From Swiss-Prot:
This is Small ribosomal subunit biogenesis GTPase RsgA. Its cofactor is Zn(2+). CDD domains: YjeQ_EngC. The gene is rsgA. Residues 340-363 are annotated as: Disordered. Its EC number is 3.6.1.-.
Length: 363
């Protein structure tokens, strides 16, 4: 990183949220504690470390904080792509508070949270209109995005295929009812992809999430106007693809926005902090509040407003089944989170190192 004072107009071109120095007290306090450090943004995350940048053209391999190398250090407290950090030379000295994020419960038996991307304005949930089209997976992504501070936009790629058009129309109607934007595009066609421009203005940051083979890397290349990201063909029998993107990376776009491409994620576990109403099920939650019994399971109870809506053809029964499944998963994850918090508090009281716990980030 440069030893000159921060160039805030240039930092704005990679997503810096203010025209000058930070305007939030928490950021100001960290700046004051590190007067010799300069701000930079994490633009790549690898298993072996990070790459950070303070301009769209220049980046350096960054030395992470020593505590981030400890196996039991909470994963959510390590930097993620999109994070803002303070650096002295090539060394990260502080992680600045996140303004928004998208995260998931990490794979495995033990409770951890994984930050997928930080300080983002928009989450593009990418799904192909092919054999991999899965409305239930879209709902799961919407749940993870909800409450994180970023706006979800569902992007259906391979719009030139018509086999799943009827299913897509049903999803469109459900999303429109909740004011969640949906755009169908041909990821290889610049004119078609132009439909995403409203969310890719100067200084904005968006992240692409979705399964392998959904077209995220193809979409990235079209937005860039060049073949920067490697793409692979998908299997014809199930439309699944290999992991083209192997690590998360933030890429400046010609529009002045920044785009974060991510590898396909096979497992999308809730963290226990999700709000079903904010995560794509506001209509179901509103109906559930009208049920006769507060603990209604929406199966066969008398006075169930959710079942009545299903019987009237106003709700998709498969969507309600997914809602109930996700509600159980969120409750289970919330119990694990509470246990971790309790262990953390006991560890602090005893003077022992507390158990790792991923606490909610600042939004």
């Amino acid at each position: 990183m440069s030893d000159t004072p921060p160039d805030y107009p240039t930092l704005q071109s990679i997503g810096w949220p203010w025209p000058g120095p930070p305007e939030e007290a928490a950021w100001q306090a960290i700046f004051a504690a590190h007067p010799q450090a300069l701000p930079a943004r994490v633009v790549e995350q690898h298993r072996t470390g990070y790459v950070a940048a303070d301009t769209p053209q220049a980046s350096v391999k960054a030395e992470s904080l020593p505590e981030w190398q400890r196996p039991r250090f909470p994963s959510h407290e390590r930097a993620a792509v999109g994070d803002w950090v303070l650096m002295e030379g090539k060394r990260i000295v502080a992680l600045l508070p996140r303004r928004t994020s998208i995260k998931r419960g990490a794979a495995g038996e033990h409770y951890h949270q994984q930050v997928i991307a930080a300080n983002i304005d928009t989450v593009f949930i990418v799904c192909g209109l092919d054999a991999d089209f899965n409305p239930r997976r879209i709902e799961r992504y919407l749940l993870l995005v909800g409450g994180g501070g970023a706006q979800p936009v569902v992007v259906l790629t391979k719009a030139d295929q018509t086999e799943y058009a009827e299913d897509a129309l049903a999803v469109l109607e459900e999303l429109e009812a909740q004011n969640i934007p949906l755009r169908a595009v041909n990821a290889k066609d610049p004119d078609s992809v132009a439909a995403l421009r409203p969310w890719l203005g100067d200084g904005r940051t968006a992240v692409l999430v979705g399964s392998s083979g959904a077209g995220k890397s193809t979409l990235t290349n079209t937005l860039l106007g060049t073949q920067k990201m490697k793409t692979n063909a998908v299997r014809e029998n199930d439309s699944r693809g290999r992991h083209t993107t192997t690590h998360r990376a933030l890429i400046p776009l010609p529009s002045g926005a920044c785009l974060i491409d991510t590898p396909g994620m096979r497992e999308l576990k809730p963290t226990g902090e999700e709000d079903l109403a904010e995560g794509g099920f506001s209509d179901v939650e509103a109906l559930a509040a009208q049920c006769r019994f507060n603990d209604c399971a929406h199966i066969a109870e008398p006075g169930c407003a959710v079942r009545a809506a299903i019987d009237a053809g106003e709700l998709d029964p498969e969507r309600v089944a997914n809602y109930m499944k996700l509600r159980v998963e969120v409750a289970s994850a919330a119990e694990k989170l509470a246990t971790r918090v309790a262990q953390n508090n006991r560890g602090k009281g005893s003077g022992k190192r507390p158990a790792s716990v991923d606490r909610p980030g600042r939004r």
